């Protein structure tokens, strides 16, 4: 008869039984898998459906655990546990999502002037265009009536943009717009602080970001942050001025962060260095300029320049070492502390608590939270007195983080962190007491300090720190003491060398294992990253960051941190300037990614050489993958989702070009850097031509970033000779009559005429119009062409015949100035793409223009509702929308009337 041993019985020793460790692994894996499946939902179920999943799964798990000893067959029992736990993960995550989604902004409140009262709950972000902040809403009124808003909203208080009642008047791009959108300087934003209560008039909209293949999911990021509406403060002269109602200390950490950031910028004159220090101390990544981010990414050290999981983990490790050292030294005064709690345990728990405080001061962002939960799980398991194998420690930490933050599974940082930790677990030495966050489990008597109480020899004493000082001072003679000092010195040097060797090997292992994953997630990897990190990791973590943090207590230390950062910055800039500093590959499918990660892991593991060599062929799919291209004689047009502006990629069998590059959002951000560069990298494109239709900022804003990424591309445009882009790359004029052929596809410029350059008028009138045809299907890209130019094209018999197209880029985003009836009658497209921003201030495309398209049975695709739009000459009867292809429930569904 089996003898009961807690949860484990002798019967469990049979290979056909469900052993507790295997059962736990099945439960954890199932839970994570269930969460992952739920995150693939395009739409949420009813809330009661998720409740049913939870109740059913919990009931089944209860029965399984109660009757676990009767499950004699291993795999059926494990599969059942996996399935039930997956159902639990699916149901719990769906329930949380449905509860959260119920508080979303009512679409009827979008674009309305709402009077809100609330409290600033996070450190405001100040920029060149104003200030951005988060407001916890306590009350809201619309036209005197109470309305319900999401608990937390993100607002911008901008200078230089506002509204006022006025007569309809022209705007700079030649369009006319409703009077409520006339431009006017707003009241300058006031200095906001966390904890302050404000009353203000705001205009809100649902969270809406750009939706592009392989692009950043802004809506998911806001979902994770708990933001369910974005908008701006109405602060023009015709609006009631925002009113500060008072201050409170309900957010002291955020107020302290803001004060420290202001002190850093007041002390450090170099704004770039000040931004880096602010990022390291208070987690303000927005303080780092884009040019610096480009250098950090090119050298593979971007993870160091913000408070990331690495910083928090290193901080916990260092803090645990210091606390353990102090704990041991306390025995010189009294052994009470060491007898009450071993030094290793004190260091582990103390390091965790201090790391949590560091993460809190860094803003308690979602990545920081994940790191703390992971560290907490590891510490609890390592200090539990049981010898957990590393896969179980890793898996339990993974499950805890996923349970607390399910949407972390969709974030690149999550996978990089856990793969790195898993690789270090798998390739490192066995866990032991040298691990400051863990340590070997101590015998029960040792944990009580029994050996020390019995006066045992130091070698057999527990790692409490109590025995070491007493035995040290009780050793007899002076000569022996000197010899011991020499031995300690030699041992110390040997330990330093050993630690450096271990650190170098771990960096190499991480680089090797994460390279395939980085290529999958970012389509780019730094070839100089190993060298850069070998210098930057110890320098930033052991020199720059401690000095920057100590500067909070004594400001002159920020001067030393500045010098240390400047030296590192110069070295990184030199490495980034190397032509071979980075390598980019096209985005590979999931099977390639899995193979690549396995290949990297095999190469990094402590295995015989012939086993590790198997990792090389597994890496090849990631490195050599090329996306499918149009066949010879075919072409495709991809309209990127870039907001208010134009940006399209045209591809043939072996060539490609970009037509316009979208808007410039701010001094540090534009559509080229945000959208086009990542998209071109993911597609594996080296473009032949960049054509800029005309000089308006919503068409050329991203050009510098695209040109920097594509040094081989020719620049063709209608910009004037003195334009600043001419200094970046000399532009060729686009002229009617120009033509070329790629892979059986003909390209022809229809506008402007040479005479237009002699007497240029409005920039829109100079738009380059490009016709693309394979003899069967045709696309027409019309820029911001206006009525006069449209009619001129229609009036030319030769040109009119060539206007007929299957696909049309709507001229001027659907403005009243364009899309005349005769022009549409000549083009006769099946599809027309209107690239415009969601709820843009020009109301593009305007309803009267859309009516003209409807009258002619032309399907208008609007980018806010479609995202990136792809049209292919091989399938001319349909347009593929990114928002439909990759739909997830947290993404914004655009109401047609609101576009």
Language-model region placement:
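Non-globular, low-confidence helical/coil segments that flank catalytic cores
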Residues: 169-176, 189-190, 194-201, 214, ...
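Hydrophobic alpha-helical segments of integral membrane proteins
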Residues: 249-267, 276, 284, 292, ...
């Amino acid at each position: 008869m089996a003898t009961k041993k807690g949860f484990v019985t002798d019967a469990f020793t049979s290979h056909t039984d469900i052993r507790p460790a295997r059962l736990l692994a099945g439960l954890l894996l199932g839970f994570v898998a269930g969460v992952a499946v739920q995150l693939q939902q395009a739409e949420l179920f009813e809330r009661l459906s998720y409740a049913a999943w939870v109740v059913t799964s919990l009931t089944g798990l209860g029965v399984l655990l109660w009757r676990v000893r009767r499950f004699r067959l291993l795999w059926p029992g494990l599969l059942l546990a996996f399935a039930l736990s997956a159902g639990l993960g699916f149901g719990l995550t769906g329930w949380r999502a449905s509860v959260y989604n119920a508080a979303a902004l009512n679409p009827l409140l979008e674009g309305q002037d709402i009077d809100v009262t609330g409290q600033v709950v996070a450190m405001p972000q100040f920029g060149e265009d104003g200030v951005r902040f988060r407001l916890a809403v306590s009350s809201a009124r619309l036209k005197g009536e109470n309305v319900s808003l999401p608990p937390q909203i993100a607002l911008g208080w901008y200078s230089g943009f506002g509204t006022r009642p006025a007569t309809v008047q022209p705007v700079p791009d030649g369009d006319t717009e409703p009077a409520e959108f006339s431009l006017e300087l707003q009241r300058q934003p006031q200095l906001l602080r966390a904890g302050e209560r404000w009353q203000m008039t705001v205009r809100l909209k649902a969270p809406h970001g750009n939706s592009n293949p392989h692009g950043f999911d802004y809506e998911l990021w806001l979902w994770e942050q708990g933001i369910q509406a974005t908008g701006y403060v109405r602060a023009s002269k015709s609006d009631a001025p925002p009113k500060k109602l008072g201050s409170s200390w309900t957010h002291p950490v955020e107020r302290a962060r803001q004060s420290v950031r202001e002190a850093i910028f007041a002390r450090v004159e170099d704004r770039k260095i000040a931004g880096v220090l602010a990022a390291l101390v208070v987690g303000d990544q927005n303080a780092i300029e884009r040019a610096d981010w480009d250098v950090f990414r090119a050298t593979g050290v971007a993870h160091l320049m913000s408070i990331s999981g690495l910083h928090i983990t290193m901080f916990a490790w260092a803090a645990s070492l210091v606390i353990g050292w102090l704990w041991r030294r306390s025995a010189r005064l009294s052994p009470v502390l060491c007898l009450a709690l071993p030094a290793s345990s004190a260091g582990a728990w103390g390091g965790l608590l201090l790391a949590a405080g560091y993460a809190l001061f860094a803003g308690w962002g979602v990545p920081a939270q994940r790191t703390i939960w992971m560290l907490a799980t590891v510490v609890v398991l390592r200090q539990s007195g049981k010898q957990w194998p590393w896969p179980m420690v890793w898996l339990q930490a993974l499950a805890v983080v996923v349970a607390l933050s399910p949407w972390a599974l969709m974030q690149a940082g999550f996978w990089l962190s856990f793969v790195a930790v898993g690789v270090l677990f798998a390739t490192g030495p066995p866990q032991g007491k040298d691990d400051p966050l863990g340590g070997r489990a101590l015998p029960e008597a040792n944990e009580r300090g029994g050996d020390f109480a019995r006066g045992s020899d130091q070698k057999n004493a527990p790692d409490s720190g109590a025995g070491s000082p007493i035995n040290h001072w009780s050793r007899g003679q002076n000569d022996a003491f000197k010899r011991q000092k020499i031995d300690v010195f030699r041992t110390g040097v040997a330990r330093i060398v050993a630690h450096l060797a271990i650190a170098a090997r771990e960096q190499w292992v991480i680089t090797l294992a994460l390279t395939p994953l980085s290529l999958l997630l970012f389509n780019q990897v730094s070839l100089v990253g190993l060298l850069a990190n070998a210098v930057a990791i110890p320098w930033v973590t052991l020199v720059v960051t401690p000095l920057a943090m100590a500067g909070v207590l004594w400001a002159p230390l920020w001067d030393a941190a500045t010098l240390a950062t400047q030296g590192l910055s110069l070295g990184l800039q030199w490495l980034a300037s190397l032509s071979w500093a980075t390598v980019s590959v096209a985005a590979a499918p999931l099977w390639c990614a899995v193979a690549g990660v396995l290949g990297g892991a095999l190469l990094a593991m402590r295995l015989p050489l012939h086993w590790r060599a198997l990792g090389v062929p597994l890496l090849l799919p990631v490195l050599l993958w090329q996306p499918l291209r149009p066949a010879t004689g075919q072409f495709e047009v991809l309209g990127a989702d870039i907001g208010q502006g134009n940006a399209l990629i045209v591809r043939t069998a072996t060539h490609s070009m970009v037509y316009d590059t979208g808007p410039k959002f701010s001094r540090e951000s534009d559509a080229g850097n945000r959208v086009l560069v990542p998209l071109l990298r993911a597609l594996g494109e080296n473009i032949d031509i960049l054509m800029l239709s005309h000089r308006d900022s919503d068409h050329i804003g991203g050009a510098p970033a695209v040109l920097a990424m594509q040094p081989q591309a020719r620049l063709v445009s209608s910009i004037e000779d003195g334009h600043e882009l001419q200094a970046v790359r000399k532009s060729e004029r686009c002229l009617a009559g120009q033509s070329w052929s790629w892979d059986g596809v003909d390209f022809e410029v229809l506008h402007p005429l040479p005479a237009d350059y002699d007497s240029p008028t409005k920039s829109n009138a100079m738009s380059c119009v490009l016709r693309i045809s394979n003899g069967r299907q045709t696309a027409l890209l019309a820029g911001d062409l206006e009525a006069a130019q449209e009619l001129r094209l229609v009036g030319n018999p030769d040109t009119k015949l060539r206007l007929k197209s299957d696909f049309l880029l709507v001229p001027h985003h659907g403005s009243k100035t364009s899309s005349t009836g005769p022009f549409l009658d000549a083009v006769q497209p099946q599809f027309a793409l209107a690239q415009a921003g969601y709820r843009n201030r020009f109301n593009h495309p305007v309803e009267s223009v859309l009516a003209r398209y409807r009258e002619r049975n032309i399907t208008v695709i609007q980018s806010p509702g479609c995202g990136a739009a792809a049209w292919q000459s091989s399938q001319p009867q349909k347009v593929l929308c990114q928002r439909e292809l990759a739909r997830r429930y947290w993404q914004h569904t655009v109401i047609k009337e609101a576009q």
